[in-house]
C-alpha cells in the first residue's frame, strides 16, 4: 500500500516501567497540535496476540472502549476522543494478533506467491500498510501512533522495526519518535535519578531508533541541570528533554506540555509552519472547575463487579469528572462491590450514608448480580437518584419486575435459563451466534425518545445515537405488565422493538439505558445523562439528605435460581 505523502508521523514509545501515561501524552500532544490549527488523528498499536480486547477480562485489560463503527478497542482511545473531541474508528486500534491473522489469511489465499512468509518483510510490511490506513483517510496533517508496552518487551519488536524502516523511507522531517521515560525521586537521597532513562534509551538504540524527544515523568519538576544531564547521556538536545511531573488531574497535562513547549519542538522538527496560537482558556476553565468547584461535593456510589480494578470503569469515572465540572461540584466516587450485598451482612443504612446517587455499572455473567439488584432496590425505595448502564439497566428491570410487579422469579436468561419470567432475554439475532469475539451488538445505533419523558427533558431532542455492546435485551412480552406498575419505556429503536431507555414515573431520578453513554462524554461536551444524574444527586444532597431514611433494607434473600458463581 502506498503511504500518503505530506502526513507527518509521530510515534510515542515508553520505557522503564508500564503505565507511565503514553495514552495521556499522545492525547495531550494531539490536542495541542489541533489547537494550533492542524488536523490530527491518533492510533494505538497493542503488542498482544488477541485480535481485539473484546474477550479479555476487565481485570487484565480494563475497559473495552467501543467506537461508533463497532470496534472493541483499547481504553486509550477514550482518552484520544475526550482530549481531541474527535471520533476514533476501527482503524484507530491495531493489535499484533490482527496483524498475524491478516498475514496468515493472505498466505492461505496464496497472496505471497508461494514464498516463505517471515516477520521481515511480510509482518513488518503488513504493519506499515496498516499505519498508512488511517493516514489516507481524512486529509491529515499529523498522525500520532502510540505503541503499547515497554521498550525491551519482545512483543513490541515488530512495531519498532516498522517504525525504524518508515523513518528511513520517509526521512527525519516526516517522522519522529517521542520516548516517555521515568525519572524516579529517591527520598533518602533527596535526588532525581536519571540512570533508568539512560538505560531505556540504550535499549531503544539497540533497535536502531534514536529518540528525537524525551518526555520524563517524575514526582518532582526536572531542573535544568537534570535535563542537561539526560540530554548529554541520551544524545538529545536539552531543549528536547521535556519534564512532566505529577499533577492533580490528567487534564492538566496539556497545559504542562504547553509550558514545556513540546508542541513547538515537534512542529520545528517536522518542518510544520507555525500555525495559530492555541487558545486554551476553555481548558484552563475546565481544570479550574475540576480542581476548585464552588458548589460543594456529591458522593456517587458506583456498584460493579470489577471494583478492585477501577480501569474497568475508566470512561464512567471520566464522565463523572466532566459532569462534576459542568455542575460546579466535586464528584467523589465510592466503589461498591456487588458481592458484598449478597453476603447478608452489608449494612445499607451505614454504608450508604452520604451517598447521593447510585450508578450500577455494566458487566457480564451472574457473579454479583443479586448484589446489584439489592443496591437498585435500595435506591428505588429510598428515592435516591439512580442510573443503570447496560447490565445496570437490565438488573433494574429485574428488580422492578420482582419487587413491584410480583414476578418473584424474574430474571435474565443470561443468569438463569429456566426462569419463569425472562424479562431480559437473548436478542433474536444472537441465538445462532457461536463465536464470542466481535459478535455482540456493537457500535452506534439510533434511539427514538418519547416526548414528555425524563429522557426527553435530559436530551431535549427526539433522535439520538449511542454506542452499544450487548447480547441481551428487554423481553417485550413483559412491557405492558411493567408499564402498568409505573415503568416508562422512554427510548426505543426506531422500529419500537428494542427498549433502549427505562425510567420510573414516581421517582426523583431513575433512569436505565441499554447503551453506553460514558463513551461519548467529553471535556467540551459532557454527556447529558451524566450531567443530569449529577445535577439530581446535587439536588438530593442539598435537600433530601435532611430527611431521615425510614425504610430499612431487608436482609438479602437470594432468589431460588442457579447457584451464583
Swiss-Prot record:
Catalytically driven reaction(s): UTP + L-glutamine + ATP + H2O = CTP + L-glutamate + ADP + phosphate + 2 H(+); L-glutamine + H2O = L-glutamate + NH4(+); UTP + NH4(+) + ATP = CTP + ADP + phosphate + 2 H(+)
Subunit note: Homotetramer.
Function: Catalyzes the ATP-dependent amination of UTP to CTP with either L-glutamine or ammonia as the source of nitrogen. Regulates intracellular CTP levels through interactions with the four ribonucleotide triphosphates.
Gene3D superfamilies per the UniProt record, alphabetical: 3.40.50.880, P-loop containing nucleotide triphosphate hydrolases
Gene Ontology biological process: 'de novo' CTP biosynthetic process; pyrimidine nucleobase biosynthetic process
Residue ranges of every copy of the Glutamine amidotransferase type-1 domain listed in the record: 299-543
Name assigned to this protein: CTP synthase
Residues at the active site: 390, 516, 518
Record-linked PANTHER family: CTP SYNTHASE, CTP SYNTHASE-RELATED
Chain residues that bind L-glutamine: 59, 363, 391-394, 414, 471
Amino acid at each position: 500500500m502506498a503511504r500518503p505523502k505530506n502526513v507527518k508521523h509521530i510515534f510515542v514509545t515508553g520505557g522503564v516501567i508500564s503505565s507511565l501515561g503514553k495514552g495521556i501524552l499522545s492525547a495531550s500532544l494531539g490536542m495541542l497540535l489541533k489547537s494550533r490549527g492542524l488536523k490530527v488523528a491518533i492510533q494505538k498499536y497493542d503488542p498482544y496476540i488477541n485480535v481485539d480486547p473484546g474477550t479479555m477480562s476487565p481485570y487484565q485489560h480494563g475497559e473495552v472502549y467501543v467506537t461508533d463503527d463497532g470496534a472493541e478497542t483499547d481504553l486509550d482511545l477514550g482518552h484520544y476522543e475526550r482530549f481531541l473531541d474527535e471520533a476514533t474508528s476501527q482503524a484507530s486500534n491495531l493489535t499484533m494478533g490482527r496483524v498475524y491473522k491478516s498475514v496468515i489469511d493472505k498466505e492461505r489465499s496464496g497472496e505471497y506467491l508461494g514464498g516463505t512468509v517471515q516477520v521481515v518483510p511480510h509482518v513488518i510490511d503488513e504493519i506499515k500498510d496498516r499505519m498508512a490506513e488511517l493516514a489516507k483517510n481524512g486529509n491529515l496533517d499529523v498522525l500520532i501512533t502510540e505503541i503499547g508496552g515497554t521498550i525491551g518487551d519482545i512483543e513490541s519488536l515488530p512495531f519498532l522495526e516498522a517504525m525504524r524502516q518508515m523513518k528511513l523511507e520517509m526521512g527525519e522531517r516526516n517522522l519522529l519518535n517521542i520516548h516517555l521515560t521515568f525519572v524516579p525521586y529517591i527520598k533518602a537521597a533527596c535526588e532525581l535519578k536519571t540512570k533508568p532513562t539512560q538505560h531505556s534509551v540504550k535499549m531503544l538504540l539497540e533497535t536502531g531508533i534514536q529518540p528525537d524527544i524525551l518526555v520524563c515523568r517524575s514526582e518532582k519538576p526536572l531542573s535544568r541541570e537534570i535535563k542537561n544531564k539526560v540530554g548529554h547521556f541520551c544524545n538529545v538536545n536539552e531543549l528536547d528533554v521535556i519534564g512532566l511531573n505529577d499533577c492533580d488531574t490528567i487534564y492538566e497535562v496539556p497545559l504542562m506540555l504547553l509550558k514545556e513547549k513540546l508542541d513547538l519542538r515537534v512542529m520545528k522538527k517536522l518542518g510544520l509552519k507555525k500555525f495559530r496560537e492555541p487558545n486554551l482558556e476553555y481548558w484552563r476553565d475546565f481544570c479550574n472547575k475540576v480542581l476548585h468547584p464552588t458548589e460543594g461535593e456529591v458522593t456517587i456510589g458506583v456498584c460493579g463487579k470489577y471494583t478492585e480494578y477501577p480501569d474497568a470503569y475508566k470512561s464512567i469515572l471520566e464522565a463523572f469528572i466532566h459532569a462534576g465540572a459542568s455542575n460546579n461540584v466535586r464528584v467523589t466516587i465510592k466503589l461498591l462491590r456487588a458481592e458484598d450485598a449478597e453476603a447478608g451482612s452489608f449494612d445499607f443504612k451505614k454504608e450508604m450514608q452520604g451517598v447521593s446517587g447510585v450508578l450500577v455499572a455494566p458487566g457480564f455473567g451472574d457473579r454479583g448480580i443479586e448484589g446489584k439488584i439489592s443496591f437498585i432496590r435500595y435506591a428505588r425505595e429510598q428515592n435516591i437518584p439512580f442510573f443503570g448502564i447496560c447490565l445496570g439497566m437490565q438488573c433494574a428491570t429485574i428488580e422492578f419486575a420482582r419487587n413491584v410487579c410480583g414476578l418473584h422469579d424474574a430474571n435474565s436468561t443470561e443468569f438463569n435459563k429456566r426462569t419463569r419470567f425472562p424479562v431480559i432475554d437473548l436478542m433474536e439475532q444472537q441465538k445462532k451466534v457461536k463465536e464470542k469475539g466481535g459478535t455482540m451488538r456493537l457500535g452506534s445505533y439510533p434511539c427514538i425518545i418519547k416526548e414528555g419523558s425524563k429522557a426527553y427533558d435530559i436530551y431535549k431532542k427526539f433522535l439520538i445515537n449511542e454506542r452499544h455492546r450487548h447480547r441481551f435485551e428487554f423481553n417485550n412480552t413483559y412491557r405492558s405488565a411493567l408499564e402498568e406498575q409505573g415503568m416508562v419505556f422512554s427510548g426505543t429503536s426506531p422500529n419500537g422493538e428494542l427498549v433502549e431507555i427505562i425510567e420510573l414515573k414516581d421517582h426523583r431520578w431513575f433512569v436505565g439505558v441499554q447503551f453506553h453513554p460514558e463513551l461519548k462524554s467529553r471535556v467540551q461536551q459532557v454527556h447529558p445523562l451524566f450531567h443530569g444524574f449529577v445535577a439530581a444527586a446535587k439536588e438530593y444532597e442539598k435537600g433530601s439528605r435532611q430527611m431521615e431514611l425510614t425504610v430499612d433494607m431487608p436482609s438479602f434473600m437470594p432468589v431460588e435460581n442457579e447457584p451464583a458463581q
